[in-house]
Regions:
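Extracellular loop and loop/strand-boundary signature of outer-membrane beta-barrel proteins
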Residues: 18-23
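Surface-exposed patches in mature extracellular/periplasmic domains of secreted proteins
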Residues: 47-54, 99-103, 284-286
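An aromatic- and glycine-enriched ligand-binding surface/loop that stacks and positions planar moieties
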Residues: 39-40, 58-205
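Outer-membrane beta-barrel translocator domains and adjoining extracellular loop/strand segments
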Residues: 13-17
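Extended, hydrophobic/aromatic-rich amphipathic alpha-helical segments that build helical scaffolds
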Residues: 1-11, 27-45, 55-92, 119, ...
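Flexible, polar/acidic helix-loop-strand segments at domain edges
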Residues: 171-248
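Long, intrinsically disordered, low-complexity segments
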Residues: 27-29, 33-35, 107-165, 239, ...
Length: 359
């Protein structure tokens, strides 16, 4: 994330001594450090393809393979595409991973560490004591609170209230086919729920308080589901038990399809792409073009932190991230926006040795 956000950052792999200033590497230099480190780890041949249930959350070979493919593809390093494809196909050939039959089950509590899950960050509400004064202690996550509607009537539609941030765009909801189960598993139409309830029970007049950029739609994948923080012992809004899904098997398939389409090697890109496409109930096969693969990634991974980086690495950011009709986005993305500006306090702390990004 530091590499993706800031690109040109200080790097050190040994403890620093006074004055504690590390050499600033370029984004390309840092990439080489990361990718060769991963290659060294893989060559050790000590990681299991998947951990047993008592060790879920530990690094596995499949997780390292996915991280390797992610950074190689983000860097557009075609010299390593064939290696990344080999790693994806090792996961695909493993009996330890597969697609969940029903997409709607993936983000339920019962879907945590399913056969589709390659890596998750564990969160728990059981005796969780994370609080405002101790945010780094083990416990739950605050994400459901952040993204659920503000002053929502708790328990309605089995959802609880949050702070109303990060609503889902209506255009995202409408991008899905009506029979695509990913639509409702991703986009919760909260306003429609209240409208239907109030039509049946007009005296209730249920509502929630709208916040900035409200659309009536919220991210269902990590929503504040009633009861998912019932066993916490501290601040309920900070201790939800929703695990954060980092890598899923569907991404392995789409990575493989894309790498083959980009010329990384032989393989059935169409098969891999349509395994994901058809799992969503879409019976008409699609061709493995880069545009189709990136669109399938869009539909598959809304809210999972993939889309923005896909737009950058595929050169689509400048044409997609443009001023919107609502007045929220007023500037177009440009290549100078790829990296954030380095905070001035960090430049000061580095005794002026850091070169600022051209933001």
């Amino acid at each position: 994330w530091v590499w993706k956000f800031w690109g040109n950052v200080p790097y050190f792999d040994k403890n620093l001594t006074a004055p504690y200033v590390a050499e600033q590497l370029t984004a390309d230099q840092l990439y080489e450090k990361m990718v060769t480190s991963l290659e060294e780890v893989i060559q050790l041949n000590v990681l299991p393809m998947r951990e047993d249930s008592e060790n879920y959350g530990r690094v596995t070979l499949a997780m390292v393979y996915m991280l390797y493919a992610e950074i190689v593809m983000y860097q557009n390093d075609d010299s390593r595409y064939s290696t990344a494809l080999k790693y994806m196909e090792e996961i695909i050939s493993s009996p330890q991973y597969d697609l969940m039959p029903d997409y709607t089950d993936i983000f339920k509590e019962t879907g945590e560490w399913s056969i589709e899950s390659i890596f998750e960050i564990n969160y728990k509400d059981d005796n969780a004591v994370r609080d405002w004064g101790s945010p780094l202690v083990a416990g739950g996550t605050a994400l459901p609170t952040l993204i659920s509607p503000y002053i929502w009537p708790n328990g309605t539609d089995n959802h609880d209230r949050g702070w109303g941030f990060c609503p889902v765009r209506k255009e995202t909801y409408e991008r899905y086919s009506n029979n695509d189960p990913r639509r409702n598993a991703t986009c919760w139409n909260a306003q429609a729920v209240l409208d239907a309830h109030n039509a049946e029970h007009p005296g209730d007049k249920l509502s929630y308080t709208t916040r900035y950029q409200d659309t009536g739609f919220f991210l269902e994948k990590y929503a504040a589901i009633t009861g998912n923080n019932k066993d916490q012992k501290s601040s309920s809004e900070l201790n939800w038990n929703n695990n954060l899904r980092i890598y899923r098997y569907s991404e392995t398939l789409l990575n493989a399809a894309e790498l083959i389409t980009r010329g990384a090697g032989q393989g059935d890109a169409k098969k891999y792409l349509n395994l994901v496409h058809k799992r969503a109930g879409l019976v008409t096969e699609i061709e493995p073009t880069l545009d189709n693969i990136i669109e399938e990634r869009h539909l598959e991974f809304v809210g999972e932190g993939k889309r923005y980086w896909d737009l950058i690495r595929t050169g689509k950011a400048a044409s997609v991230l443009v001023p919107d009709a609502y007045g929220y986005r007023t500037n177009s993305w440009s290549s100078s926006k790829k990296y954030l500006p380095i905070p001035q306090k960090e430049i000061d702390a580095a005794k002026g040795t850091l070169v600022q990004n051209n933001y």
